[in-house]
């Protein structure tokens, strides 16, 4: 058994029981797991008798999942693809889609991937291992653009100070390691005894989201799921921070037939409902799960049931997102 297989065996998927209860996978049901990761949801769905198409853009996850393909052949199909393209892998409507947004435990545990400052490694953070890295971003974007990334994607209160520090320090020595960046941020911001959250947490979150275009990926994935679900099909989304959760909430509200009501956004005209919520406010982990799996602390599950109405047009404006500079100098 490889190290990746061992990590997958130890992986505990968050909110698994609420996910299964909500999706209600019947024997033979066709389900898309858009974020395969360590395969926790996929394995549970297969054990329930479902047929699963599992996607992941991380080649390491695909390689680690081959043993699961062999175990459940022919009911599991594993595809190296971003979940925003999930409507490209099916020709018929499906019964359910599940998305577990963000970084996986396996990615966090591998120091060489550069997702976490808990273990020193290269400042990388690329899920697909292609394109620009977090080091590229930190060492080349202007301070004002870094500040917007930290503020918008990480909700970091010291975004400006941290960005200016980075710009000044990199002129002398570039940031190449996760530990180096985390230490520099902690030295600038400080850390009080007993602080539960490391001062670099939000900056690392923002960089990861930016490098992997996770916000754009989530938006496109929600629209794609709307197109592939049959009437009565269920869409479940597990998110781990408020920015993602607000996007998911806005999506379901905009698809409820009631339109969006916000003084900050243009009002969306009423359209036929394409989803109705399965439960109000989302589901979070109970005390038992929190004790068994601390990672579930920030997880929230929202779920909707597809109606027979036609899928609505994609409209990024409904998410109310601010623009940030792209690495190439345009807009992301």
Curated annotation (Swiss-Prot):
Record keyword S-adenosyl-L-methionine present: yes
Subcellular location: Cytoplasm
Principal location: cytoplasm
Chain positions recorded as S-adenosyl-L-methionine binding sites: 39-41, 56, 83, 100, 107
Reaction catalyzed: cytidine(1402) in 16S rRNA + S-adenosyl-L-methionine = N(4)-methylcytidine(1402) in 16S rRNA + S-adenosyl-L-homocysteine + H(+)
Biological process annotations from GO: rRNA base methylation
Alphabetic keyword roster: Cytoplasm, Methyltransferase, rRNA processing, S-adenosyl-L-methionine, Transferase
Molecular function GO terms recorded: rRNA (cytosine-N4-)-methyltransferase activity
Pfam families assigned to the protein according to its UniProt record, in alphabetical order: Methyltransf_5
Keyword Transferase tagged: yes
EC annotation from Swiss-Prot or TrEMBL: 2.1.1.199
TM regions (residue ranges): none
One Gene Ontology cellular component: cytoplasm
Function: Specifically methylates the N4 position of cytidine in position 1402 (C1402) of 16S rRNA.
Record-stated family: Belongs to the methyltransferase superfamily. RsmH family.
NCBIfam families, per the entry: 16S rRNA (cytosine(1402)-N(4))-methyltransferase RsmH
PANTHER family: 12S RRNA N4-METHYLCYTIDINE METHYLTRANSFERASE (PTHR11265:SF0), S-ADENOSYL-METHYLTRANSFERASE MRAW (PTHR11265)
Protein's recorded name: Ribosomal RNA small subunit methyltransferase H
Origin species: Bartonella tribocorum (strain CIP 105476 / IBS 506)
Organism classification: Bacteria, Pseudomonadati, Pseudomonadota, Alphaproteobacteria, Hyphomicrobiales
């Amino acid at each position: 058994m490889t190290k990746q297989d061992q990590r997958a065996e130890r992986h505990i998927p968050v909110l698994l029981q609420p996910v299964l209860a909500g999706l209600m996978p019947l024997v033979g049901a066709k389900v898309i797991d858009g974020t395969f990761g360590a395969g926790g949801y996929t394995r549970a769905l297969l054990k329930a008798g479902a047929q699963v198409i599992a996607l992941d853009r991380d080649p390491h996850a695909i390689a680690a999942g081959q043993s699961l393909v062999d175990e459940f052949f022919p009911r599991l199909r594993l595809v190296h693809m971003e979940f925003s393209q999930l409507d490209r892998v099916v020709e018929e409507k499906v019964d359910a889609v599940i998305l577990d947004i963000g970084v996986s435990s396996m990615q966090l545990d591998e120091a060489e991937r550069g997702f976490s400052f808990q273990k020193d490694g290269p400042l990388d953070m690329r899920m697909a291992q292609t394109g620009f890295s977090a080091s590229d971003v930190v060492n080349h974007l202007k301070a004002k653009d870094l500040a917007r990334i930290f503020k918008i994607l990480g909700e970091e209160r010291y975004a400006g100070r941290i960005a200016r520090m980075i710009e000044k320090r990199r002129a002398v020595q570039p940031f190449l390691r996760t530990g180096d960046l985390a230490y520099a941020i902690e030295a600038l911001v400080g850390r009080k005894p007993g602080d539960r959250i490391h001062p670099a947490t939000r900056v690392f979150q923002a960089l990861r989201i930016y490098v992997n275009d996770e916000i754009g990926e989530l938006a496109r994935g929600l629209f794609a799921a709307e197109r592939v679900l049959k009437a009565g099909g269920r869409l479940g989304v597990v998110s781990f921070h408020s920015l993602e959760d607000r996007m998911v909430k806005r999506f379901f509200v905009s698809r409820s037939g009631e339109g969006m009501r916000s003084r900050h956004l243009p009002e969306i005209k009423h359209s036929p409902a394409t989803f109705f919520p399965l439960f109000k406010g989302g589901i979070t982990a109970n005390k038992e799960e929190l004790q068994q799996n601390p990672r579930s602390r920030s997880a929230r599950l929202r779920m909707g049931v597809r109606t027979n109405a036609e899928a609505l047009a994609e409209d990024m404006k409904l998410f109310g997102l601010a623009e940030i500079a792209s690495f190439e100098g345009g807009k992301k």
